[in-house]
């Protein structure tokens, strides 16, 4: 097992490139899909335990008509609020309400860093507080033991639409991604992985990525920010 044992959901919408479609991936179930069920307005994917691993809505303005009166979907990532998950549950006929507020972005602490010979990469172990330490291959210059940063779990979706998968990099397993502020759509420049205020507990969900909010009280800037 390499996932964090708790489910989370990534919801992604893009009007133009996805032609008004929205997709969702349920992270810790994302690699166990066995069958697909279709409707003219949606489809979903189910594993051998009869649990949904992901879903698509082909015309969200139709499926979420009343919902659109009080809420607009963001271009890109959308936070899985209780209201959204209730509506998705109603449409699919599956209870996904427990996924409300469950996101793939979590605060982690780097507990070991080993350079990979003849590359700029490092083999890192990170602690999320939710499971055993995870192996991540990272190329950031600023990664170091003891720093807190943001982990995107396997099955999570970045603001760019990229889905994070378990992979091998330079011959080593990597089961997630440590992200820069640029990759989290918080900053235009890529200055290494984001550094989180050391007072923040590991395992906390990192929701700034949904708010497009730069330098919250969680983020370490040049001047240390004290928690209120």
UniProtKB/Swiss-Prot annotation:
Any one GO molecular function term: tRNA binding
Keywords: RNA-binding, tRNA-binding
A Pfam family: tRNA_bind
InterPro entries listed in its UniProt record: NA-bd_OB-fold, tRNA-bd_dom, tRNA_bind_bactPheRS, YtpR-like_sf
Domain tRNA-binding intervals: 99-207
Stored NCBIfam families: YtpR
Protein name: Uncharacterized protein MG449
Gene3D superfamilies tied to this protein: Nucleic acid-binding proteins, YtpR-like
């Amino acid at each position: 097992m390499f996932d964090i044992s708790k489910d989370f959901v990534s919801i992604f919408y893009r009007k133009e490139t996805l032609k008004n479609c929205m997709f969702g991936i349920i992270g810790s179930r994302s690699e166990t899909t066995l069958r697909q069920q279709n409707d003219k307005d949606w489809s979903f994917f189910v594993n051998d335990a009869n649990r949904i691993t992901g879903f698509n809505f082909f015309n969200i303005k139709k499926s979420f008509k009343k919902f659109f009166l009080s809420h607009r979907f963001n271009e890109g990532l959308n936070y899985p609020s209780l209201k959204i998950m209730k509506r998705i549950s109603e449409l699919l006929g599956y209870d996904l309400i427990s996924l409300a507020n469950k996101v793939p972005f979590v605060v982690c602490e780097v507990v070991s860093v080993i350079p990979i010979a003849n590359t700029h990469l490092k083999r890192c172990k990170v602690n999320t507080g939710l499971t055993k330490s995870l192996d991540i291959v990272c190329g950031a210059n600023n990664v170091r033991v003891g720093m807190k940063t943001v982990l995107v779990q396997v099955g999570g979706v970045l603001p760019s639409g990229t889905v994070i998968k378990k992979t091998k990099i330079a011959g080593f397993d990597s089961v997630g991604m440590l992200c820069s502020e640029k990759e989290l759509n918080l900053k235009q420049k890529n200055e290494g992985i984001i550094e989180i205020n050391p007072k923040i507990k590991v395992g906390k969900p990192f929701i700034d990525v949904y708010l497009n909010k730069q330098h919250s009280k969680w983020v370490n800037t040049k001047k240390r920010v004290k928690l209120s």
